Amino acid sequence: MANHKSAEKRIRQTLKRTERNRYYRTRIKNITKAVKEAVASNDATKAEEALKVANKDLHKFVSKGILPKNTAARKVSRLHASVKKLSAQIA
């Protein structure tokens, strides 16, 4: 256990940040999973709706400083490519 006041504060801060980061990591994982599942089930409309939500949320995380800009762009690009490929198969 911590012996100094500053160390106790650091422990509290670390716990708070860990909890917040866990929330965002889970949210990002669930967002991308929703798009991938919609693509896997060959449901183009559901995939496009999920992609819209993913695009909005990932860019929101960039503006909050949670994700680097290029990381979000890469994730959105890959999701968009999979949805586009699905749309091409159906059409």
From Swiss-Prot:
Sorted UniProt keywords: Ribonucleoprotein, Ribosomal protein, RNA-binding, rRNA-binding
InterPro entries (UniProt xref): Ribosomal_bS20, Ribosomal_bS20_sf
The UniProt record lists the keyword Cell division: no
Source organism, top-level taxon: Bacteria
Keyword presence, Acetylation: no
Gene Ontology molecular function: small ribosomal subunit rRNA binding; structural constituent of ribosome
GO biological process terms held by the UniProt record: translation
GO cellular component term of the entry, any: cytosol
Reported function: Binds directly to 16S ribosomal RNA.
Family, per entry: Belongs to the bacterial ribosomal protein bS20 family.
Name assigned to this protein: Small ribosomal subunit protein bS20
Organism (species): Wolinella succinogenes (strain ATCC 29543 / DSM 1740 / CCUG 13145 / JCM 31913 / LMG 7466 / NCTC 11488 / FDC 602W) (Vibrio succinogenes)
Taxonomy of the source species: Bacteria, Pseudomonadati, Campylobacterota, Epsilonproteobacteria, Campylobacterales
